């Protein structure tokens, strides 16, 4: 009886938000760039729900702010047809983990480094670096 009650109570507790590993965080970002259902092929949404799920508090408001971007930073292009995505941990340094991501987008090789932190909600993105820019700088530059 006590076990059944404990299982029932555990079932009523909301599941913890966030991602359990840096790799799962990055995989879930790129799930929005697939070629399946329309809600999963339009890129990462620019709404508060997606911002809260994927980004640290300092980056959330920049992600949802109105702006005119020449391309989607996460795929380095205004359109996409992604090939296989390679995800690997570059290094763990204090509270940050650096995750390398490489893929082919319409015949062009793309490499990005995700800087992720493990916060109270799980793993979230603190910044993303391309060879020429960072997501924070990109969003600030193209803000309205």
How would you name each of these model-derived features?
Residues 1-7:
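Sec-dependent signal peptide recognition
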Residues 18-19, 52-108:
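Surface-exposed, charged secondary-structure patches
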Residues 21-26, 47, 51, 55:
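Stable alpha-helical elements in mature extracytoplasmic
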Residues 37-47:
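Surface-exposed patches in mature extracellular/periplasmic domains of secreted proteins
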């Amino acid at each position: 009886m006590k076990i059944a009650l404990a299982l029932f109570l555990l079932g009523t507790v909301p599941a913890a938000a966030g991602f359990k590993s840096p790799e799962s965080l990055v995989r879930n970002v790129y799930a929005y760039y697939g070629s399946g259902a329309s809600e999963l092929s339009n890129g990462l949404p620019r709404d508060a729900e997606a911002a809260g799920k994927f980004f640290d508090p300092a980056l959330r408001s920049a992600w949802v702010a109105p702006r005119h971007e020449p391309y989607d930073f996460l795929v380095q292009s205004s359109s996409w047809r992604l090939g296989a995505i390679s995800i690997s941990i570059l290094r763990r340094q204090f509270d940050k983990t650096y995750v390398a991501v490489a893929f082919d987008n319409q015949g062009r090789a793309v490499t990005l480094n995700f800087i992720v932190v493990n916060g109270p909600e799980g793993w979230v993105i603190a910044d993303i670096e391309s060879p020429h820019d960072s997501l924070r700088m990109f969003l600030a530059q193209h803000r309205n």
